[in-house]
Design a protein with these regions (language model features):
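A sequence-level detector of short linear motifs
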Residues: 44, 132, 165-166, 184-188
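Contiguous beta-strand/loop segments that form the cofactor/metal-binding neighborhood of enzyme cores
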Residues: 80-175
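Predominantly a Rossmann-like dinucleotide-binding segment in NAD(P)-dependent oxidoreductases
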Residues: 14-20, 24-114
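Alpha-helical scaffolding segments of alpha/beta enzyme cores, especially the outer helices
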Residues: 6-9, 35, 84, 120
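C-terminal helical cap and adjacent loop that interface with cofactors, partners, or active-site loops
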Residues: 155, 182-202
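Hydrophobic beta-strand positions in blades of beta-propellers and related beta-sheet-rich domains
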Residues: 33, 176-178
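Rossmann-fold NAD(P)-binding glycine/threonine-rich loop
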Residues: 1-17
Length: 202
């Protein structure tokens, strides 16, 4: 508690916000990916990609007002996953836009969107590794906000000897697909979450 309070006080004194990182690093799929990186299964890592988006929350105007947005709502999961796997960012470049200037939400009806609903980040990590994250509230997804049944990869890593893809969202993973020079046909690993739920960090 004491260390957390000190961080909170420091952030407040500088006019900044602070929140706990999502618990995506607790999943067995994350652990498997980290193990493969540490073992050198992918060779020299070059790049990674994170993707998370849907058509936007309808239950609250908060997401479209100042201090809301897709990055703190969605992108933060991918940031936690990729910095957890690749280490901290040495440099960051980001761009945000508003794609849908008006929304209808349950608590306020029709509103003007005043915070980004479309964001992209590029991070530079150690050893020349680059990662890219895209998130937004304008992405049609047939699996919806909850992503149930999602079979596409939303986290991907590429190296000189192989590539690896987390299937499903990083907060609700369904497995990891791995391909290497030695085994080019993708193999699925860790299809079970073993009790992991994203709310562990809430």
């Amino acid at each position: 508690y004491k260390e957390g309070k000190e961080l909170y006080d420091l952030a407040t004194s500088k006019g900044l916000r602070i929140w706990g990182a999502p618990a995506v690093v607790n999943s067995p799929q994350f652990a498997f990916m980290a193990e493969q990186i540490n073992k050198g299964t992918l060779g020299n890592l070059a790049c990674a990609h994170g993707h998370y988006g849907h058509e936007g929350p309808s239950w609250s105007a908060f997401f479209y007002e100042p201090l809301g947005g897709s990055m703190p709502d969605l992108g933060v999961y991918n940031i936690a996953t990729l910095t957890g796997l690749l280490g901290p960012a040495k440099s960051v470049v980001a761009m945000t836009t508003i794609v849908t200037p008006e929304r209808t939400v349950d608590d306020k009806g029709k509103i003007k969107v005043r915070e980004e609903d479309n964001a992209m980040i590029i991070m530079e990590h150690e050893k020349g590794v680059l990662s890219h994250i895209e998130c937004g509230f304008n992405y049609f997804d047939p699996y919806g906000h909850l992503g149930k049944g999602q079979e596409k990869a939303t986290i991907s890593l590429y190296g000189s000897h192989g590539n690896m893809h987390m299937v499903g969202y990083d907060w609700a993973p369904n497995g990891v697909d791995l391909s290497t020079m030695d085994h080019p046909v993708p193999q699925r690993f860790v299809p079970d979450t073993n009790g992991y739920v994203w709310q562990e960090g809430a």
